[in-house]
Amino acid sequence: MSNFSLSPSPTSGFSLNLQNPTKTSYLSFSSSINTIFAPLSSNTTKSFSGLTHKAALPRNLSLTCRHSDYFEPQQQQQQQQQQPQGASTPKVFVGYSIYKGKAALTVEPRSPEFSPLDSGAFKLSREGMVMLQFAPAAGVRQYDWSRKQVFSLSVTEIGSIISLGAKDSCEFFHDPNKGRSDEGRVRKVLKVEPLPDGSGHFFNLSVQNKLINLDENIYIPVTKAEFAVLVSAFNFVMPYLLGWHTAVNSFKPEDASRSNNANPRSGAELEWNR
């Protein structure tokens, strides 16, 4: 809040005194102009702020002004610009876990990777995936995560699980060392098959590692409800694993207009107009 004092002046009729001149303000009259100047009477006409009034008898008038709300958003914007540019949203880890008597299963998404281009844009360099972590039981409601085995599902493998019916099954084979000198020394096979009683599916991960002489099978049943949660989560996260959310968020009307003007008869444009 800032205070103005209005006092008579022999030459101009009134003088305006600003007690706090450092802030930009506008006048906000609590009463109308007619109420303020109605008691004033004189034969001499003076002009003040575009308003016509007659010279008044000697008296002091007090006017109160407040700062415009327009300046508050500007101050907030300046404060935001002063924040460190390196500051970003902290990374969040999420997952869905299933605990059974002989094993536990944790499902976690992994984000895709992007590489920068010379134009300043980014291109998808690696699709995201879903990490399955199997841990054998070490006791009642206890699991040995130091012996966990992992299996990464690609987007295509996720699609296979999503499309499974109540009596359908699928199988995936992974060799982490494929293309290397020790190819074939580690073998991972994940089987997803329906339970005999039709109550859900079981996930069976078989790991053979000749490098450390390991041969292990981890089996965990998944109920219909738990499987439905997995399918729902897979459907939701699929566009993010493909990186499509970044492209959709970057769509701008001016980009489409500029592209059409640069190549008005492109193949995509002709196909869309059919």
From Swiss-Prot:
GO molecular function terms listed in the Swiss-Prot or TrEMBL record: DNA-binding transcription factor activity; sequence-specific DNA binding; single-stranded DNA binding
UniProt-annotated stretches for the region Required for ssDNA binding: 100-105
Localization of this protein: Nucleus; Plastid, Chloroplast
Keywords in alphabetical order: Activator, Chloroplast, DNA-binding, Nucleus, Plant defense, Plastid, Transcription, Transcription regulation, Transit peptide
Transit peptide: 1-54
Coiled coil: none
GO process terms (BP): defense response to fungus; positive regulation of DNA-templated transcription
KW Plastid (keyword) present: yes
Pfam families: Whirly
Gene Ontology CC: one annotated term: chloroplast
Segments for region (Disordered): 253-274
Renumbered ranges of motif Nuclear localization signal: 178-191
Main location: nucleus
Record flagged with keyword Chloroplast: yes
Protein family per UniProt: Belongs to the Whirly family.
Complexes and interactors: Homotetramer.
Family matches, as PANTHER family: SINGLE-STRANDED DNA-BINDING PROTEIN WHY1, CHLOROPLASTIC, SINGLE-STRANDED DNA-BINDING PROTEIN WHY2, MITOCHONDRIAL
Function description: Single-stranded DNA-binding protein that acts as a transcriptional activator of the pathogenesis-related gene PR-10a. Upon elicitation, binds a 30bp promoter sequence known as elicitor element response (ERE) and is required for PR-10a expression.
Protein name: Single-stranded DNA-binding protein WHY1, chloroplastic
Origin species: Solanum tuberosum
Originating gene: WHY1
